[in-house]
């Protein structure tokens, strides 16, 4: 009866522990930070996107203001006031003294106002393109940070697992030594292997903490949550055969196109400045009670008598600036094409390497460790061979994870050349 009670108690304890572990696992899965959620959080927290929105709004407000005619100018004053003689400082005695009120306005041409408004509209479009570029950069950085943390966790788990296995090897070596069937040097060798793995585990934990911190730079405190499953990184939205056409939508190229449009709008402003505006002024002047009041009407217009040395040069300067913007855009397009092609080629080559790791390298290192362990247990092999095989196995596993991280980072670079590119992937 007592034995039955003891067994029942142990069963209940084990059941409670299993349920607790299961509950904790379920809670972690519910609270897991998915890849797409991280992208959404990064977009919600970004102040750069708000800054670009504000820039676009400011430019559109300026465009509306630039399309309006200038405000009239009100003038008031006293003209021809005597300062000496019997009538000094008198407003009424001298027939030339007048109190004047006037209104003037520059009659700015419609084409000038339209050119200025158009320029601000192009600035607003450039800001909108800048927002798309900022979103693309944000998604790429957030994706890379999420992937970095994911694989750093996997490295830490691999090292921790190897460390646990090495601890069992210490116990086995110590038992063999105490039983007189193994040398003491095997004990020290096993302990040294554990110490090396402890150091490696500390480095892996550090790398994981740094990766979590860098992810937090983009998504805040949510970076501390456990991560969900890895997204599908086997497809990218680009294809080498149509890469040049696809890069026409690259946000940075779009920004440069809009900046080029701003430069062309500056040309129109400079050309419109070669046509002078008229200014009209109406003034009413009141004299003393013994004299007649007066009214005057004036018009004025700037005389552009050295147009070839001033206005024409300003137009030429704006044309040269627009040509510079065009040349820079074309050069940047070529650079982006080469960079994207290099990224695509590297991603494809890495995927082939990963297949070799999975099909050949990792199974071989696992089999080598198993064979060395079997030989050691049957007293036909040495502990050094086991430890060497374990080192080779962990090196291969970590190298595989590092290659996976590099490949995933390349995937993020390719996927977010354009915002949301992962939504329409092409298997390469």
Locate the predicted segments by residue:
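Acidic, low-complexity, intrinsically disordered peripheral segments
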Residues: 3-7, 26-29, 84, 399-428
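Bacterial N-terminal signal peptides
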Residues: 10-20
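Residues that define the transmembrane beta-barrel architecture of outer-membrane proteins
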Residues: 95-99, 291-295
């Amino acid at each position: 009866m007592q034995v039955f009670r003891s067994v029942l108690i142990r069963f209940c304890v084990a059941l409670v522990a299993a349920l607790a572990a299961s509950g904790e696992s379920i809670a972690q899965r519910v609270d897991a930070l998915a890849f797409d959620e991280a992208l959404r959080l990064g977009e919600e927290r970004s102040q750069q996107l708000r800054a670009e929105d504000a820039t676009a709004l400011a430019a559109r407000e300026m465009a509306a203001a630039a399309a309006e005619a200038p405000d009239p100018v009100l003038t008031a004053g006293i003209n021809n006031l005597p300062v000496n003689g019997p009538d000094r400082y008198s407003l009424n005695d001298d027939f030339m003294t007048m109190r004047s009120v006037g209104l003037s306005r520059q009659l700015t041409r419609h084409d000038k106002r339209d050119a200025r408004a158009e320029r601000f509209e192009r600035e607003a479009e450039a800001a909108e393109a800048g927002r798309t570029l900022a979103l693309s950069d944000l998604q790429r950085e957030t994706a890379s940070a999420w992937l970095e943390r994911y694989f750093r966790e996997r490295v830490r788990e691999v090292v921790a697992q190897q460390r646990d296995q090495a601890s069992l090897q210490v116990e086995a070596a110590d038992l063999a030594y105490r039983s007189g069937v193994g040398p003491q040097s095997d004990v020290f060798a096993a302990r040294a292997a554990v110490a090396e793995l402890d150091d490696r585990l500390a480095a892996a934990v550090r790398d994981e903490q740094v990766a979590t911190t860098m992810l937090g730079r983009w998504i805040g405190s949510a970076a501390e949550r456990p991560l969900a499953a890895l997204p599908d990184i086997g497809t990218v939205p680009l294809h080498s055969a149509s890469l040049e056409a696809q890069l026409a939508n690259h946000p940075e190229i779009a920004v440069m196109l809009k900046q080029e449009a701003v430069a062309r709008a500056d040309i129109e402003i400079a050309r419109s400045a070669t046509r002078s505006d008229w200014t009209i002024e109406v003034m009413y002047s009141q004299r003393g009670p013994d004299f007649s009041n007066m009214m005057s009407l004036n018009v004025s217009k700037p005389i552009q008598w050295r147009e070839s040395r001033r206005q024409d040069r300003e137009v030429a300067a704006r044309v040269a600036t627009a040509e510079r913007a065009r040349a820079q855009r074309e050069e940047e397009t070529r650079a982006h094409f080469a960079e994207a092609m290099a990224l695509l080629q590297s991603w494809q080559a890495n995927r082939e390497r990963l297949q070799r790791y999975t099909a050949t390298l990792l199974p071989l290192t696992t089999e080598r460790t198993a064979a060395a362990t079997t030989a050691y247990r049957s007293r036909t092999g040495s502990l050094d061979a086991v430890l060497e095989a374990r080192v080779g196995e962990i090196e291969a596993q970590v190298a595989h994870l590092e290659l996976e991280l590099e490949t995933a980072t390349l995937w993020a670079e390719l996927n977010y050349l354009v915002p949301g590119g992962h939504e329409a992937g092409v298997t390469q």
